[in-house]
A protein has these predicted regions:
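Cytochrome P450 substrate-recognition site 1
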Residues: 1-60, 84, 88-97, 111-140, ...
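Conserved cytochrome P450 catalytic core segment spanning the I/J/K helices
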Residues: 49-53, 92, 124-134, 153-223, ...
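Cytochrome P450
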Residues: 52-63, 73-98, 106-115, 137-163, ...
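Central I-helix of cytochrome P450 enzymes
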Residues: 92, 96, 157-165, 192-243, ...
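Conserved cytochrome P450 K-helix E-x-x-R motif and the immediately C-terminal K′/meander segment
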Residues: 163, 234, 253-296, 316, ...
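Cytochrome P450 heme-thiolate "Cys pocket" and heme-binding signature region
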Residues: 209, 295, 333-364, 391-393
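Cytochrome P450 heme-binding "Cys pocket" and the immediately downstream C-terminal segment
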Residues: 234, 305, 357-397
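Conserved cytochrome P450 K-helix/beta-meander segment immediately N-terminal to the heme-binding cysteine loop
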Residues: 307-335
């Protein structure tokens, strides 16, 4: 495992759709390992996803979640079940959009709605079967993708996404634009572009694409799995709610990002969710850079390597009762998902570990804490917890196969 994640390997990047929508691998997630990638990643971490930067975006997360809580509290009738798949995706997407592009209304909001639609198409297209990805050495593989219309689909999606990014960058660089009180992600990227001569406009667009792919999908999927497990394990839900509500005792006060450091049991719930339901069960494929020998086996150069973190999280050699949702297993131990504990690697490890873990963890923990604090959650009438399907689906991101419908009741204390 150490060899695969930290040794002579690189991320396998011959993913046809991803290569196109990341402007020829000008991003972080899909770019090949080289000096240029190392420089971009260093800038990305220091400028965009550092702890200080995550803290600066807390206002947007608190505002977005606050709007959701108000909306759920005022819905009519109050006994109506809520589709959490749609609700949570819209929430996280709205937060990423607010952080990336700033406040939106009117025509801007309409254009963003179109962007959301095209982005959803992109995620579906990236999960489609591509002959080039599975048979990269066969000349006919690209012909097959063209024949079934996959290449044309990628191209259309790319052009629409690029058009939106170009419009946003132009608006932010307009000398007559009124600067907001807080810089959004595009402001930060433009500032970086002006300071760093090697950073191009395509780099900016590719990094924005990374933010949406990594931020929107993985966070909403993790939240859905967490709430699914909690509704099937009501004792765990009550324990998590008791911790949050004992901390936030003041009426009318909502959970704040600063509260998260004191919610130890909630963090165990998130760890246990990621152990059983990593957003990407197979990490982004890697390949060897050189011929190497591992445990007596010869591994040729350019060998593809797949890391099954889903299986690692359920390995009985590492975990007691591995199929059981039991957050208490993390009590009193320092196991985390930041890449140093190889039994729990939902976001990878080594030099290709996801650089945005702090932001993703904050989004998931804060949203989950807020929903558990403000509402009591029940299944619709006639539905038992045993009826809640835990079947998943997806090629790159593994999400619930069926929507999760729950009834939130406002907690009055």
């Amino acid at each position: 495992m150490l060899f695969v994640l930290e040794g002579n390997i690189i991320t396998f990047l011959n993913i046809s759709g991803a290569k196109l929508i990341t402007y020829g691998q000008q991003d972080i997630a899909f770019s090949p390992y080289n000096a240029s990638w190392r420089e971009r990643r260093k800038l990305f971490v220091s400028e965009l996803v550092s702890s200080k930067r995550v803290q600066s975006f807390a206002y947007a997360l608190e505002a977005q979640v606050g709007e959701l809580i108000q909306s759920l509290s005022l819905r009519s009738p109050p006994t109506e079940a809520v589709n959490l798949n749609e609700t949570l995706f819209t929430l996280i997407d709205g937060f990423i959009g607010r952080v990336a592009f700033g406040s939106m209304n009117g025509a801007k909001l309409m254009k963003y709605a179109k962007f959301q639609q095209v982005f959803s198409e992109a995620m579906v297209a990236l999960s489609a079967f591509s002959a080039q990805d599975f048979f990269p050495t066969l000349p006919m593989s690209r012909w097959f993708d063209k024949l079934v219309g996959l290449e044309a689909r990628y191209q259309r999606i790319f052009l629409e996404l690029d058009s939106y990014f170009e419009m946003v960058l132009s608006q932010h660089m307009d000398p007559g634009r009124v600067k907001p009180d807080k810089d959004d992600l595009v402001d930060v990227l433009i500032s970086l572009w002006k300071r760093q001569g090697k950073v191009t406009k395509d780099h900016l667009k590719a990094l924005l694409m990374d933010a949406f792919i990594g931020g929107t999908t993985t966070s909403s999927v993790t939240l859905l799995w967490a709430i699914s497990e909690l509704i099937k394990n009501p004792a765990v839900m009550k324990k998590a709610q008791a911790e949050i509500r004992s901390l936030v005792r003041v009426k009318q006060r909502l959970v704040q990002v600063d509260d998260l450091c004191k919610l130890n049991y909630l963090k165990m719930v998130v760890k246990e969710t990621l152990r059983l339901h990593p957003p990407a069960p197979l990490l982004v494929p890697r390949e060897t850079m050189d011929h190497v020998k591992v445990l007596g086996y010869d591994i040729p150069s350019k060998t593809r390597i797949f890391v099954n973190v889903w299986a690692m999280g359920r390995d009985p050699a590492c975990w007691d009762r591995p199929e059981e949702f039991y957050p208490e297993r993390f009590e009193g131990i320092d196991t985390d998902f930041y890449g140093s504990h190889y039994e729990l690697l939902p976001f990878g490890a080594g030099r290709r570990i996801c650089p945005a873990i702090p932001m993703g963890a904050t989004i998931v923990e804060f949203t989950l804490a807020s929903l558990l604090h403000s509402f009591d959650w029940e299944l619709p009438d006639g539905v038992r917890k045993e009826d809640v399907s835990m079947e998943g689906t997806g090629r790159q991101v593994f999400c619930r196969k069926t929507p999760l419908y729950l009834v939130p009741s406002v907690y009055t204390g």
